[in-house]
Amino acid sequence: MGVKNIVYNLMINFEDIINHQIELLRYAGKNSDTFTVITTLKKPYSKRPPNFIHDKIMMELSPYMVDYIVGIKEWPGTYRSGGSHTVMLTYRLCKNSRYLLEKLENWYLPLKNGLPEDICFYRKQRPWFGSVSHEKMAFMWNATESDLTNLENLSIKFSIQNK
């Protein structure tokens, strides 16, 4: 019989993420294919491609944008009943986009730093490491033993939600 890979769903201590955000961005960037952030449309709403309230901050990342969804109501960790002006931006990860992510202020304090909210990293097109910043919550879905070891090496506390 083959060895079964065990995967875990984790709740991660948000304060630890804030304190180790650069190391986590590096790890997530190297172990993900894409990432998403949540922003809001700004007027004129009919412009295509649309204007976002975080346009100036996100301008450097624009060459790496692969998609956007206007009017999104659900994304990893969040569901909203309203919000037709909410936008999910999807970016591909590569050496340059990882560098730009690290260069900006702390992604886990978006309101303080004027950044889009709820950064989420995707592995094999599935949500893997995400946050709900205004709730101060962070998750890791389908975490591997390697992911757990990395969190432990960074002294980031987490709880396993499944065994």
Predicted regions and their residues:
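Structured alpha/beta or helical-core interaction and ligand-binding surfaces enriched in interleaved
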Residues: 1-163
